[in-house]
């Protein structure tokens, strides 16, 4: 096998999950020579704005995909939730490895439970999806946008006017943070995850047969089925970071996939949700999207995308 160059964002989390995946490959073949190349993406440069206000899909992947096309790197290790549902021609998701916990972590000052936060308490999040779902269930709370890596957000919780913050549990787990800092993990009934949350997508060139063969050895078929249902739903709904959209699939009994899709208005007042079972992940994602469109969910998306 030739020397492999892995493209990664420069954040601590991106570099850590890239190294963890490389370790997985080296466990299969210790002779592999793999190097990480750090790449700065457009999304990394935007630190003072809410990402949903910036617009555009692929804020964290476009520059990395360009390096794949130019053969500067051989593969990219993405957080799957950052990867748009349409992969450019010539590139492919070569494998979907094991999924980390897909839920969100709620961290509060003095570990006050979410349901006990008082009127006007401020919850920090960088996600419209989280904000909308929290406002829907707890309309007396205030959502305030928060950006930055995990360390920055935890520091802001201590030093600024936030009463609590919500962030992806997978990032905390991969960075080795103790469960002790988390007040609680919010299950799907409280906060439906983002599309692909907790999963990685390993992107490479479609014609790189040697690498695709290697990646097949760390591919998790069940996780791939689940995220395919989720990403099909995202594509069918024309979802973007301007839209509060959630989706989560699991393997149920009889090897069926159970998938729940969710579209909300940013203020949490409108909610469209549907759960279905099926064996074909693409058909399942389409089915749930069609139900939500009939309910009127697409009107929200159209409005938000037009305002972009």
Swiss-Prot record:
Complexes and interactors: Monomer.
Similarity-based family: Belongs to the HMBS family.
Protein name: Porphobilinogen deaminase
Keyword Transferase appears in the UniProt entry: yes
Modified residues annotated as S-(dipyrrolylmethanemethyl)cysteine in this record: 241
Native species: Staphylococcus epidermidis (strain ATCC 35984 / DSM 28319 / BCRC 17069 / CCUG 31568 / BM 3577 / RP62A)
EC number: 2.5.1.61
Extra facts: The porphobilinogen subunits are added to the dipyrromethane group.
Cofactor binding notes: Binds 1 dipyrromethane group covalently.
